[in-house]
Amino acid sequence: HLKDGAPKAGVARVTAFETGTNAWRRLPDWPACSSPGCAVTPTPLYLRAGRSLGFAAPVPGDAPFDEYVSDPATPVPYRPRPVLGWGYEDDNGWSRWLVEDQRHASARPDVLTFVSEVLSGPLKVAGRPVAHLVASTSGTDSDWVVKLIDVFPDEVPGRPEMGGYELMVASDVFRGRYRESFETPKALAPGEALTYRFALPTANHVFLPGHRVMVQVQSSWFPLYDRNPQTFVPSIFEAKPGDYRKAVQRVFHEPGRASFVELPLVTAP
């Protein structure tokens, strides 16, 4: 209020929407737990053998990696096909792609899907998840897409359309040629396991009891992100048809070469 002596407006310094619980939260600051008595702990959520996901690190004897074939001729679409509408009209899909059901991707052989056990209690993340991927490619360039997903129970009372729904919480892509420098792109060594570390967008989300956590890894996200020929060329915009080649992609999950997503877990109220 501009008027002297007017009552305080009661506006919080930060008002943030919390997905999962679907509630507005009044916060003294952001990140959500920068206030006394509240702690955010960066916690690795490991990709494990058997396409599982958990907070326990891989152990000796586990299968060392999972692999898939990435083909630029059949890229993973960013949303289910057919993709209709590109404007911002009410009947188009563009405005809803961030909450699109990801089952269209998890069913593909060129997408690795890792899933946790059913949660017995709420799991809250507030901040930026960070992907730590140890991966190799048979090509000389590669894209790595990591998606953090909330998997709903098979049955949701009162909302049957949400049964088994795979809701994207945070996701991003990293182009391998920029692993060492954005200014000086560099070809990847075929077959060499390299570490890729990149932050996903900020999330303020609660995975509810009965839900599961999922991480998807893929190498295309078309047409949201342009296709990588998977052969290093000075400029992808000038890539020739012959530069676009299939590649075998491996994601490692063994001691010493563990892949994980670091979650900003809220560990106190």
PLM features: what roles do these ranges have?
Residues 1-269:
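C-terminal, loop-rich substrate-recognition/catalytic regions characterized by aromatic stacking residues
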